[in-house]
Structures are given as structure tokens and as C-alpha cells.
């Protein structure tokens, strides 16, 4: 199938950078900075739809499902990146948020551009991870028409999964297939067609919103503190102590000792201190509160 790139919004030329090859380094990055400043305002009108995606993500996880990101090239890498950040930040299992990139894991490091053109590959990748109706599939494609993503979303729809599409063009094809469309045109790129720039930045901002707000909704934060952070190195152990100190006002020695008693859990340690209860009682309170510290520390 022949594609007319001139009809794709992400392939349009930017009138402000027609002489890009004649600009100084400072002029180039000044123009890039000016263009980047437009991204947040381009996303703003789409916040209600992004919020709907987040509500679906929370619902899916509470029912035992997973969040599946899928995309090709930059879009795929961004999905993999966001998924990879969830376990250390929120203490969730590595298979709760999954990132799929056309061409497999090797494509994260070395581009495999041809793989994005296969509708069947999108379906097969979802079959391989055992996609079921409890999951949500979020397809990402700056152009809004990547066959790999279209194939995955169509298959997910057939199974009865919740689906969402994130693109950077008007009335995207992936948005037509998905339950919720988040089509955020950000205008022509500084370097024509290089969607790793503004389009990629917009996608990253949206993914940040989805994963962060979903995890907060699941009780992974108390106030604005990461209470389920994994302590895999000295920096994170120190952060865990700081989190308990900030949440409760205790000294570092008390925070450290309570975290040890809480078997490494910031969330349990905070509940123990603020509810003045034992480890066992704190665990029970959190279970009853579905992991939300604010509810767990309320007087019974």
C-alpha cells in the first residue's frame, strides 16, 4: 500500500525552520525550545479523555488485569520506558505494566523500521503475552496509522479489552479502532517528520500522566510521597527513610528502625507510626483500605 506522506500531519514542514541548515546552534535550540513550549497547551484540551483512560487502567488493575502499551519506533520505546519505570517507582510487579515494541526487545536499541508495517505482528505479540479481556491495550503512533498498532488494537477489541489510542494527528486511524482516542496534534516538527521530537515529547507527557495518576489511584502515594518505592540501592533506601520522615515527622533513626520492622515497606512503616499500631495491624489496615494509607490510618 502506497502512503501519501503529505496527508499525514506529522510529516508537514515547519514554516519557522525552513532555513534550519543555516541556523547557528543557539538559533536551532531556541527554535526547538519555542516549539516545545507549545506541547503542554496542545495536550490540555484532551485531559478529559486522558482521565477516562486512567479510570479504565485503575478498573483493569483492580480486576486483575494489566496495562499493555504498544507502538513502533519512538512510540514503542516510550511505552517500554514508562512500563519499566513502574516497578521501582510504585513497587508493582514487572508484568503489571507491559511495553511492546514492533520488532521485539532488540528494536528498543536498534531501529527495525519494517516491523511496524505488519498488522499481524501486532496481534501475534499480544497473543504471545496472553492478552485477555481483563487487560487494557494502549496503542501509540505519532502518525496515527501504524499497522502494528492497528493490528493490536483490533485484536484487543475482538477480545473485549478496554482500548485507547494516543496519536499526534487529527482523526487518527488508531483512534477510530480504539474505545478512547487521544489525538494530540502538536504541529510540524522542527526537523520535518522527526516525530521523536515534539510528538515523542507529547506522548511521554501523556504516558507520565497515565501511569502516575493510575498508581496514585491505586494507593501508591500518600500525600505526594512514593510510599511503595522499591529499595534496591543505597539512594533508594535513603529515599525511603526520607519518605517516612516526611510523612510522620519522626527522626531518621526511628524511620529506619520502623522500616526494618515493616519488612522494608514504607507504606506499612508510615501506617504503624501514624496509627500507632503493630506491624500486623498496619498490614491488616492497609488490606482493608485497598492499599490507601490515608484511609488505613483513620481511627476505627
Cite the ranges covered by each PLM segment.
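Active-site pocket-shaping loop/turn-to-helix segments
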Residues: 41, 48, 111, 232-233
Amino acid at each position: 500500500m502506497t502512503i501519501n506522506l503529505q496527508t499525514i500531519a506529522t510529516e508537514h514542514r515547519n514554516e519557522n525552520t525552513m532555513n534550519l541548515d543555516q541556523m547557528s546552534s543557539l538559533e536551532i535550540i531556541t527554535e526547538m525550545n519555542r516549539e516545545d513550549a507549545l506541547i503542554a497547551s496542545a495536550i490540555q484540551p484532551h485531559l478529559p479523555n486522558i482521565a477516562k483512560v486512567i479510570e479504565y487502567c485503575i478498573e483493569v488493575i483492580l480486576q486483575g488485569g494489566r496495562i499493555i502499551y504498544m507502538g513502533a519506533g519512538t512510540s514503542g520505546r516510550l511505552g517500554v520506558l514508562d512500563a519499566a519505570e513502574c516497578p521501582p517507582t510504585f513497587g508493582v510487579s514487572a508484568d503489571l505494566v507491559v511495553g511492546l515494541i514492533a520488532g521485539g526487545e532488540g528494536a528498543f536499541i536498534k531501529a527495525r523500521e519494517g516491523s511496524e508495517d505488519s498488522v499481524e505482528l501486532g496481534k501475534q505479540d499480544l497473543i504471545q503475552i496472553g492478552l485477555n479481556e481483563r487487560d487494557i491495550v494502549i496503542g501509540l503512533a505519532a502518525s496515527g496509522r501504524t499497522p502494528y498498532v492497528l493490528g493490536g488494537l483490533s485484536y484487543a477489541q475482538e477480545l473485549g479489552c478496554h482500548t485507547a489510542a494516543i496519536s499526534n494527528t487529527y482523526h487518527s486511524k488508531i483512534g477510530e479502532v480504539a474505545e478512547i482516542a487521544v489525538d494530540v496534534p502538536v504541529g510540524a516538527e522542527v526537523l520535518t517528520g522527526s516525530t521523536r521530537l515534539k510528538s515523542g515529547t507529547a506522548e511521554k507527557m501523556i504516558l507520565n500522566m497515565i501511569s502516575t495518576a493510575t498508581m496514585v489511584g491505586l494507593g501508591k502515594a500518600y500525600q505526594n510521597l512514593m510510599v511503595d518505592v522499591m529499595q534496591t540501592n543505597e539512594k533508594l533506601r535513603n529515599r525511603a527513610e526520607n519518605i517516612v520522615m516526611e510523612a510522620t515527622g519522626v527522626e531518621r533513626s526511628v524511620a529506619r528502625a520502623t522500616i526494618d520492622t515493616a519488612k522494608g515497606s514504607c507504606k506499612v512503616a508510615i501506617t504503624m507510626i501514624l496509627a500507632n499500631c503493630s506491624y500486623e495491624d498496619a498490614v491488616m489496615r492497609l488490606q482493608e483500605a485497598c492499599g490507601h494509607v490515608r484511609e488505613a490510618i483513620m481511627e476505627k
